[in-house]
Amino acid sequence: MIIDSHAHYNNNAYKKPFRYLTRNADGYALKEGDREQLFRELLETDIPYSIEPGVSLQSCDEVLILASEYPGRIFPTIGIHPTRSIFEKWSDRHKLAAFARKPGVIAIGEIGLDYHYKREEQHRMKQHLWFVYQLNLAWKLKLPVILHVRDAHEDALRILKWHPARKLGGVIHCFYGSREIAEQYLKLGYHFGIGGSILQLEERAKDLWGAIPIIPLERILVETDAPFILPYCKDVIQPKLLRRARNTSLILPAVIEKIAQLKGVSVDSVEQATTLNTVHLFSLPVEITPKAE
């Protein structure tokens, strides 16, 4: 059994029939369908659960609705993404706290800092304001966090080192940093969300490939960030067909296989460990049945 620790199935990309990525004997293939069909396929391929992070006040409402439509399969988290925080009113922060207190919410996220895009200085200040507020909320509610940190590790680590919320644990979502950065998050006790970034060509993935061997297996979760971060598959699928194609949890076996290769361990051991890690970190109400020998 595999759990997708980070997907956005409430995204508009899944609200009408769509083209999506799956796997076949050649590696990858495209299919046409809708979200209900995709969720049936995930159930059939033993990828029954996913964690659905909020990224804005509107999406927090949407993830709670989606979780109510798929009880016991979709687990909601509440948060404001750093790049969305500049569009939210600070006076509306009480709405976020109200969402976070809803039954079934398992974490605060995704939250953090993102300096990838050029921003005015006041935008970074607003990111910091929301980040610390949401860490405070996580600490108050005793919930782990899902962290989004891009091109901002120095500032994020400085905040995380002094904030008590680090004691509750969390995951660095979509990690693709170097060994040196991984070591700093390891010292703070965080987990690492590994997804499509590990399935890119070497020139793009070499830092992450170098970091994976030093990250203990008990600190790794697998994720997709669907519908985003497609694996490299232009060698088997025409690039023009990949336009507007959605990523899905169906690629997770490939992520697990690559982690196993880089760590020199069995695929089964990675699958079992990452599933257990996800269940334990987020206290998921999921029963894990060991694979038959």
Can you say where each PLM-predicted feature lies in the sequence?
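Mid-domain alpha/beta scaffold segments of enzyme catalytic cores
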Residues: M1-E293
